[in-house]
Amino acid sequence: MLKIVFMGTPEFSVPSLEKLIENYDVRAVLTQPDKPKGRGKKLAMSEVKEVAVKNNIPVFQPVKLKNDIEVINKLKEIAPDFIVVVAFGQILSKEVLDIPKYACINLHASLLPNYRGAAPINWAIINGETKTGNTTMIMAEGLDTGDMLLKDEVDIKRDMTAGELHDILMNRGADLLVKTIDEFSKGNIKPEKQGEPETDYAAMLSKDTGKINWNDKSERIYNLIRGLNPWPLAYSSYNDKVMKIHEAKILDAAPEGEPGLITNVDNNGIEVNSSDGKILITKIQFPGKKSMNVGEYIRGNNIDKGVILK
Protein backbone atom coordinates (compact mmCIF):
# COMPACT_ATOMS: atom_id res chain seq x y z
CA MET A 1 0.00 0.00 0.00
CA LEU A 2 1.31 3.45 -0.92
CA LYS A 3 2.65 5.51 1.98
CA ILE A 4 1.31 9.06 2.16
CA VAL A 5 2.13 12.17 4.17
CA PHE A 6 -0.72 14.71 4.03
CA MET A 7 -0.46 18.47 4.49
CA GLY A 8 -3.58 20.62 4.77
CA THR A 9 -5.51 22.85 7.15
CA PRO A 10 -9.04 24.14 6.37
CA GLU A 11 -12.36 22.42 5.69
CA PHE A 12 -11.50 22.23 1.95
CA SER A 13 -8.74 19.71 2.79
CA VAL A 14 -10.92 17.35 4.84
CA PRO A 15 -12.59 15.17 2.14
CA SER A 16 -9.17 14.73 0.49
CA LEU A 17 -7.63 13.48 3.72
CA GLU A 18 -10.60 11.17 4.37
CA LYS A 19 -10.37 9.68 0.86
CA LEU A 20 -6.61 9.16 1.25
CA ILE A 21 -7.15 7.37 4.59
CA GLU A 22 -9.69 5.07 2.88
CA ASN A 23 -7.32 4.19 0.03
CA TYR A 24 -3.72 4.40 1.30
CA ASP A 25 -1.44 4.20 4.32
CA VAL A 26 -1.44 7.79 5.65
CA ARG A 27 1.59 7.90 7.96
CA ALA A 28 1.49 11.52 9.12
CA VAL A 29 -0.51 14.73 8.84
CA LEU A 30 0.95 18.23 8.89
CA THR A 31 -1.36 21.14 9.60
CA GLN A 32 -1.10 24.72 10.85
CA PRO A 33 -0.75 25.32 14.62
CA ASP A 34 -3.97 25.50 16.68
CA LYS A 35 -5.49 28.99 16.57
CA PRO A 36 -7.62 30.96 19.07
CA LYS A 37 -11.29 30.82 18.04
CA GLY A 38 -14.61 32.26 19.18
CA ARG A 39 -15.34 34.72 21.95
CA GLY A 40 -13.36 32.84 24.58
CA LYS A 41 -10.33 32.76 22.21
CA LYS A 42 -9.74 29.12 23.12
CA LEU A 43 -7.19 27.27 21.02
CA ALA A 44 -8.99 25.21 18.40
CA MET A 45 -7.69 22.43 16.17
CA SER A 46 -7.86 22.77 12.40
CA GLU A 47 -10.53 20.63 10.71
CA VAL A 48 -7.74 18.48 9.29
CA LYS A 49 -6.21 17.83 12.72
CA GLU A 50 -9.60 16.66 14.02
CA VAL A 51 -9.77 13.99 11.28
CA ALA A 52 -6.17 12.89 11.91
CA VAL A 53 -6.69 12.58 15.67
CA LYS A 54 -9.93 10.60 15.13
CA ASN A 55 -7.97 8.18 12.91
CA ASN A 56 -4.95 7.94 15.25
CA ILE A 57 -2.59 9.44 12.69
CA PRO A 58 0.45 11.33 14.05
CA VAL A 59 0.05 15.11 13.66
CA PHE A 60 2.82 17.68 13.26
CA GLN A 61 2.16 21.43 13.46
CA PRO A 62 5.32 23.30 12.51
CA VAL A 63 5.09 27.10 12.62
CA LYS A 64 7.47 27.15 9.63
CA LEU A 65 8.16 23.74 8.15
CA LYS A 66 11.22 24.87 6.19
CA ASN A 67 12.97 25.79 9.49
CA ASP A 68 11.81 22.75 11.48
CA ILE A 69 14.68 20.26 11.20
CA GLU A 70 13.00 17.81 13.61
CA VAL A 71 9.82 17.50 11.51
CA ILE A 72 11.79 17.38 8.24
CA ASN A 73 13.89 14.50 9.62
CA LYS A 74 10.72 12.70 10.72
CA LEU A 75 9.36 12.99 7.15
CA LYS A 76 12.62 11.56 5.78
CA GLU A 77 12.30 8.68 8.25
CA ILE A 78 8.76 7.91 7.05
CA ALA A 79 10.07 7.91 3.44
CA PRO A 80 6.61 8.41 1.89
CA ASP A 81 5.74 7.49 -1.69
CA PHE A 82 3.82 10.77 -1.99
CA ILE A 83 3.43 13.98 -0.05
CA VAL A 84 -0.06 15.33 -0.78
CA VAL A 85 -0.79 19.01 -0.18
CA VAL A 86 -4.26 20.59 -0.10
CA ALA A 87 -4.49 24.18 1.21
CA PHE A 88 -1.69 23.73 3.75
CA GLY A 89 -0.85 27.42 4.01
CA GLN A 90 2.96 27.15 3.82
CA ILE A 91 5.38 27.06 0.91
CA LEU A 92 7.55 23.92 0.85
CA SER A 93 11.34 24.06 0.58
CA LYS A 94 13.28 22.04 -2.01
CA GLU A 95 14.48 19.79 0.82
CA VAL A 96 10.87 18.78 1.59
CA LEU A 97 9.85 18.56 -2.09
CA ASP A 98 12.66 16.03 -2.63
CA ILE A 99 11.57 13.65 0.18
CA PRO A 100 8.86 11.46 -1.44
CA LYS A 101 9.68 8.56 -3.77
CA TYR A 102 7.30 9.74 -6.52
CA ALA A 103 6.33 13.39 -5.99
CA CYS A 104 4.75 16.09 -3.89
CA ILE A 105 1.26 16.45 -5.36
CA ASN A 106 -0.93 19.48 -4.84
CA LEU A 107 -4.65 19.93 -5.45
CA HIS A 108 -5.46 23.47 -6.62
CA ALA A 109 -9.03 24.73 -7.04
CA SER A 110 -8.73 26.21 -10.53
CA LEU A 111 -7.97 25.13 -14.08
CA LEU A 112 -4.28 26.02 -14.02
CA PRO A 113 -2.43 28.06 -15.14
CA ASN A 114 -5.41 30.38 -14.58
CA TYR A 115 -6.15 31.60 -11.07
CA ARG A 116 -2.93 30.69 -9.37
CA GLY A 117 -2.96 32.01 -5.82
CA ALA A 118 -4.82 31.86 -2.52
CA ALA A 119 -8.44 32.55 -3.53
CA PRO A 120 -9.13 30.93 -6.93
CA ILE A 121 -12.75 29.98 -6.15
CA ASN A 122 -13.76 33.52 -5.20
CA TRP A 123 -12.01 35.27 -8.07
CA ALA A 124 -13.47 32.91 -10.69
CA ILE A 125 -16.96 34.00 -9.60
CA ILE A 126 -16.06 37.67 -9.09
CA ASN A 127 -14.70 37.74 -12.64
CA GLY A 128 -17.87 36.16 -14.04
CA GLU A 129 -16.32 32.89 -15.22
CA THR A 130 -18.76 30.17 -16.30
CA LYS A 131 -16.28 27.30 -15.85
CA THR A 132 -13.57 26.41 -13.37
CA GLY A 133 -12.37 23.17 -11.80
CA ASN A 134 -9.55 21.42 -9.98
CA THR A 135 -6.02 20.70 -11.13
CA THR A 136 -3.54 18.27 -9.59
CA MET A 137 0.11 19.13 -10.12
CA ILE A 138 3.63 18.21 -9.10
CA MET A 139 4.79 20.85 -6.66
CA ALA A 140 7.67 23.12 -7.60
CA GLU A 141 9.32 25.84 -5.53
CA GLY A 142 7.16 28.60 -7.08
CA LEU A 143 3.54 29.16 -6.05
CA ASP A 144 1.16 26.99 -8.12
CA THR A 145 3.68 26.75 -10.99
CA GLY A 146 4.44 23.00 -11.09
CA ASP A 147 3.72 20.59 -13.94
CA MET A 148 0.03 19.69 -14.27
CA LEU A 149 -1.24 16.12 -13.92
CA LEU A 150 -5.06 15.86 -14.13
CA LYS A 151 -7.91 18.37 -14.46
CA ASP A 152 -11.61 18.18 -13.64
CA GLU A 153 -13.84 20.89 -15.08
CA VAL A 154 -16.92 22.25 -13.28
CA ASP A 155 -19.65 24.59 -14.55
CA ILE A 156 -20.30 27.73 -12.51
CA LYS A 157 -24.05 28.28 -12.47
CA ARG A 158 -25.41 31.80 -12.89
CA ASP A 159 -26.49 32.17 -9.25
CA MET A 160 -23.80 30.06 -7.58
CA THR A 161 -21.99 31.50 -4.56
CA ALA A 162 -18.34 30.95 -3.65
CA GLY A 163 -19.50 28.78 -0.74
CA GLU A 164 -21.49 26.48 -3.03
CA LEU A 165 -18.65 26.22 -5.55
CA HIS A 166 -16.17 25.58 -2.71
CA ASP A 167 -18.18 22.54 -1.57
CA ILE A 168 -18.43 21.08 -5.08
CA LEU A 169 -14.68 21.48 -5.74
CA MET A 170 -13.81 20.24 -2.24
CA ASN A 171 -15.63 16.92 -2.79
CA ARG A 172 -14.66 16.40 -6.42
CA GLY A 173 -11.05 17.30 -5.62
CA ALA A 174 -10.78 14.36 -3.23
CA ASP A 175 -11.71 11.93 -6.03
CA LEU A 176 -9.32 13.63 -8.44
CA LEU A 177 -6.44 13.21 -5.97
CA VAL A 178 -7.01 9.47 -5.60
CA LYS A 179 -7.21 9.06 -9.38
CA THR A 180 -4.01 11.12 -9.77
CA ILE A 181 -2.05 9.08 -7.21
CA ASP A 182 -3.21 5.75 -8.67
CA GLU A 183 -2.42 6.69 -12.27
CA PHE A 184 0.83 8.53 -11.52
CA SER A 185 2.25 5.68 -9.44
CA LYS A 186 1.58 3.32 -12.39
CA GLY A 187 3.33 5.70 -14.80
CA ASN A 188 0.12 6.49 -16.70
CA ILE A 189 0.22 10.30 -16.45
CA LYS A 190 2.55 12.50 -18.46
CA PRO A 191 3.11 15.76 -16.54
CA GLU A 192 2.33 18.84 -18.62
CA LYS A 193 4.11 22.19 -18.31
CA GLN A 194 1.94 25.16 -17.40
CA GLY A 195 1.59 27.88 -20.00
CA GLU A 196 1.09 31.55 -19.26
CA PRO A 197 -2.11 32.37 -17.31
CA GLU A 198 -4.89 34.28 -19.08
CA THR A 199 -6.21 35.63 -15.77
CA ASP A 200 -4.90 37.79 -12.97
CA TYR A 201 -3.36 36.21 -9.90
CA ALA A 202 -6.07 35.09 -7.42
CA ALA A 203 -4.84 37.19 -4.51
CA MET A 204 -5.84 36.53 -0.93
CA LEU A 205 -9.11 38.19 0.05
CA SER A 206 -9.31 40.95 2.60
CA LYS A 207 -12.38 42.64 4.06
CA ASP A 208 -11.73 45.60 1.73
CA THR A 209 -12.17 43.37 -1.33
CA GLY A 210 -15.91 43.48 -0.64
CA LYS A 211 -16.55 47.22 -0.89
CA ILE A 212 -19.14 47.74 -3.63
CA ASN A 213 -18.60 50.47 -6.19
CA TRP A 214 -22.10 51.37 -7.34
CA ASN A 215 -20.60 53.02 -10.46
CA ASP A 216 -19.87 49.49 -11.67
CA LYS A 217 -22.29 47.61 -13.92
CA SER A 218 -24.96 45.40 -12.34
CA GLU A 219 -23.23 42.22 -13.54
CA ARG A 220 -19.95 43.16 -11.84
CA ILE A 221 -21.70 44.04 -8.55
CA TYR A 222 -23.76 40.84 -8.60
CA ASN A 223 -20.67 38.71 -9.24
CA LEU A 224 -18.84 40.41 -6.36
CA ILE A 225 -21.73 39.62 -3.99
CA ARG A 226 -21.78 35.93 -5.09
CA GLY A 227 -18.01 35.62 -5.07
CA LEU A 228 -17.60 36.88 -1.51
CA ASN A 229 -20.39 34.82 0.06
CA PRO A 230 -19.93 33.39 2.73
CA TRP A 231 -16.72 35.34 3.52
CA PRO A 232 -15.76 38.18 3.70
CA LEU A 233 -19.09 39.34 2.14
CA ALA A 234 -19.67 42.34 -0.11
CA TYR A 235 -20.72 45.48 1.72
CA SER A 236 -21.83 49.06 1.36
CA SER A 237 -22.32 51.95 3.76
CA TYR A 238 -25.91 52.86 4.70
CA ASN A 239 -26.02 56.12 6.72
CA ASP A 240 -22.43 55.47 7.89
CA LYS A 241 -23.23 51.91 9.03
CA VAL A 242 -21.64 48.92 7.30
CA MET A 243 -24.35 46.90 5.57
CA LYS A 244 -23.10 43.46 4.54
CA ILE A 245 -24.89 42.00 1.56
CA HIS A 246 -25.45 38.24 1.57
CA GLU A 247 -27.79 37.88 -1.40
CA ALA A 248 -29.00 39.98 -4.32
CA LYS A 249 -30.45 39.77 -7.83
CA ILE A 250 -30.06 41.76 -11.02
CA LEU A 251 -33.27 43.58 -11.93
CA ASP A 252 -34.31 44.04 -15.53
CA ALA A 253 -34.75 47.80 -15.10
CA ALA A 254 -33.03 51.03 -16.08
CA PRO A 255 -31.40 53.12 -13.33
CA GLU A 256 -33.40 56.04 -11.93
CA GLY A 257 -30.96 58.69 -10.74
CA GLU A 258 -27.38 58.32 -9.59
CA PRO A 259 -25.51 55.06 -8.84
CA GLY A 260 -25.98 53.87 -5.24
CA LEU A 261 -29.37 55.55 -4.84
CA ILE A 262 -32.04 53.44 -3.11
CA THR A 263 -35.07 53.71 -5.40
CA ASN A 264 -37.47 51.39 -3.57
CA VAL A 265 -37.73 49.29 -0.40
CA ASP A 266 -40.34 46.58 0.16
CA ASN A 267 -40.62 42.95 1.34
CA ASN A 268 -38.85 41.78 -1.83
CA GLY A 269 -35.73 43.79 -1.07
CA ILE A 270 -33.85 47.06 -1.53
CA GLU A 271 -33.62 48.39 -5.10
CA VAL A 272 -30.33 50.21 -5.78
CA ASN A 273 -29.03 51.88 -8.94
CA SER A 274 -25.88 50.62 -10.60
CA SER A 275 -24.28 52.39 -13.57
CA ASP A 276 -26.36 50.45 -16.10
CA GLY A 277 -29.38 49.09 -14.21
CA LYS A 278 -30.57 48.04 -10.77
CA ILE A 279 -29.65 45.52 -8.11
CA LEU A 280 -32.23 44.09 -5.72
CA ILE A 281 -30.59 43.40 -2.35
CA THR A 282 -32.51 40.59 -0.64
CA LYS A 283 -30.46 39.57 2.43
CA ILE A 284 -28.43 41.91 4.66
CA GLN A 285 -26.53 42.10 7.93
CA PHE A 286 -25.62 45.06 10.13
CA PRO A 287 -22.76 45.04 12.71
CA GLY A 288 -23.48 42.85 15.74
CA LYS A 289 -26.71 41.51 14.19
CA LYS A 290 -27.58 38.26 12.45
CA SER A 291 -28.20 38.17 8.71
CA MET A 292 -31.83 38.71 7.73
CA ASN A 293 -34.00 38.79 4.65
CA VAL A 294 -34.86 42.41 3.88
CA GLY A 295 -38.59 41.72 4.34
CA GLU A 296 -37.91 40.48 7.87
CA TYR A 297 -35.51 43.33 8.67
CA ILE A 298 -37.86 46.17 7.67
CA ARG A 299 -40.58 44.90 10.01
CA GLY A 300 -38.64 46.34 12.93
CA ASN A 301 -36.15 48.72 11.28
CA ASN A 302 -36.13 51.43 8.65
CA ILE A 303 -34.33 51.37 5.32
CA ASP A 304 -35.17 54.64 3.61
CA LYS A 305 -35.76 55.22 -0.07
CA GLY A 306 -33.65 58.12 -1.37
CA VAL A 307 -30.55 57.31 0.69
CA ILE A 308 -27.35 56.84 -1.32
CA LEU A 309 -25.29 53.75 -0.49
CA LYS A 310 -21.62 54.59 -0.38
Curated annotation (Swiss-Prot):
Superkingdom assignment: Bacteria
Which InterPro entries does the record associate with it? Fmt, Formyl_trans_C, Formyl_transf_N, Formyl_transf_N_sf, Formyl_transferase-like_C_sf, Met-tRNA-FMT_C, Met-tRNA-FMT_N
What is the role of this chain?
Attaches a formyl group to the free amino group of methionyl-tRNA(fMet). The formyl group appears to play a dual role in the initiator identity of N-formylmethionyl-tRNA by promoting its recognition by IF2 and preventing the misappropriation of this tRNA by the elongation apparatus.
Annotated protein name in UniProt? Methionyl-tRNA formyltransferase
The UniProt entry, under HAMAP family, shows: Formyl_trans (MF_00182)
Query: Which terms in the GO cellular component ontology are assigned?
Result: cytosol
Instruction: Recite the UniProt keywords alphabetically.
Output: Protein biosynthesis, Transferase
| Top-tier EC class | transferase
